[in-house]
């Protein structure tokens, strides 16, 4: 093989490496994206449904409304996140939020739940929200997330923090909870994107 041909092969390899960069999601380990919301529609990336939930749908003084926002955590101009407008300012006990089906997903090879979150500075937002995971037996384990800011922030919660779940081979649901004890202010909005299981 002459020098000109060798040089051509080397250049082709270099150009291919530049054109196809390694995925940032895979750079530090393994990741399964559950929901990137980029379609701006249901279902999530693993075929699961999702939406807002209310403790008492008949109580108009409280509730969460879910919508798609064209504010992507990774800066994708065509991407989306979900926006959760919550209200727990009620004379009645109030809690509500967001649910997402995980369809029995096996998370055994992963060790952390990751996602991006930020608050809406214009409307106001709680600096704390409760994050729950449920297994197939509907056993719920919760983690109180704090330090939410008005800028996108990547959250990584080790599975060990969800200490009531002992079997990670079949998970049923991811839940966000706003409540009248921890959500201050009692009405506001947060955005969430790129929900995933990761091995870190």
Q: For each predicted feature, which ranges?
A:
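C-terminal segment of classical bacterial N-terminal signal peptides
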Residues: 16-24
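Beta-rich carbohydrate-recognition modules and glycan-binding surfaces
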Residues: 23-200
